[in-house]
Amino acid sequence: MIGRIAGVLLEKNPPHLLIDCNGVGYEVDVPMSTFYNLPSTGERVVLLTQMIVREDAHLLYGFGTAEERSTFRELLKISGIGARMALAVLSGMSVHELAQTVTMQDAARLTRVPGIGKKTAERLLLELKGKIGADLGAMAGAASASDHASDILNALLALGYSEKEALTAVKNVPAGTGVSEGIKLALKALSKG
């Protein structure tokens, strides 16, 4: 198995990459979330990878984070979901958004990903429940605790608070609280520390 690849980025054509590793060019497909964070061509790149061996091809998929690769692997375990569909899901939403979608059982949000219909979305929600990122799932659970918790959480993260601090503060915000008031309450809770 090839678990990691490091080399010079030669070509970028979404979602395909060509990476030179000591004179050998590896073709790697990446989700758009990884693609947008790549360096310019000619620069060094490091990706975590998942190799898929099929009868007619050996394919390499690359990821910028361990969470993305782990989620990709979980998606592959679901009947009817292949590597292309898993890549489409990760290109259509971040791992955090997917965890939040699964926690809230929001099939409509999943159907916005090209190639995913209602039945596939429902199967994904059922199969992924409790399986993707425990920390991300906890964050998604906290975000669903109040109507605007997701916005409050993002504001705290943007202010430089850690995910753990932000989650703890958001859990103390009563459901139905507006974003502005929720941020004030969360900041107050954080200042009491």
Curated annotation (Swiss-Prot):
It is found in: Cytoplasm. One of its GO terms (cellular component) is Holliday junction resolvase complex. Residues 1-64 are annotated as: Domain I. One of its GO terms (molecular function) is ATP binding. GO terms for biological process: DNA recombination; DNA repair. Keywords: Cytoplasm, DNA damage, DNA recombination, DNA repair, DNA-binding. Its main location: cytoplasm. Residues 65-139 are annotated as: Domain II. InterPro entries: DNA_helicase_Holl-junc_RuvA_I, Hlx-hairpin-Hlx_DNA-bd_motif, NA-bd_OB-fold, RuvA, RuvA_2-like, RuvA_C, RuvA_C_sf. Residues 139-143 are annotated as: Flexible linker. Pfam families: HHH_5 (PF14520), RuvA_C (PF07499), RuvA_N (PF01330). Residues 144-193 are annotated as: Domain III. Gene3D superfamilies: 5' to 3' exonuclease, C-terminal subdomain (1.10.150.20), DNA helicase RuvA subunit, C-terminal domain (1.10.8.10), Nucleic acid-binding proteins (2.40.50.140). Has three domains with a flexible linker between the domains II and III and assumes an 'L' shape. Domain III is highly mobile and contacts RuvB. The RuvA-RuvB-RuvC complex processes Holliday junction (HJ) DNA during genetic recombination and DNA repair, while the RuvA-RuvB complex plays an important role in the rescue of blocked DNA replication forks via replication fork reversal (RFR). RuvA specifically binds to HJ cruciform DNA, conferring on it an open structure. The RuvB hexamer acts as an ATP-dependent pump, pulling dsDNA into and through the RuvAB complex. HJ branch migration allows RuvC to scan DNA until it finds its consensus sequence, where it cleaves and resolves the cruciform DNA. Belongs to the RuvA family. Homotetramer. Forms an RuvA(8)-RuvB(12)-Holliday junction (HJ) complex. HJ DNA is sandwiched between 2 RuvA tetramers; dsDNA enters through RuvA and exits via RuvB. An RuvB hexamer assembles on each DNA strand where it exits the tetramer. Each RuvB hexamer is contacted by two RuvA subunits (via domain III) on 2 adjacent RuvB subunits; this complex drives branch migration. In the full resolvosome a probable DNA-RuvA(4)-RuvB(12)-RuvC(2) complex forms which resolves the HJ. This is Holliday junction branch migration complex subunit RuvA. It comes from Paraburkholderia phytofirmans (strain DSM 17436 / LMG 22146 / PsJN).
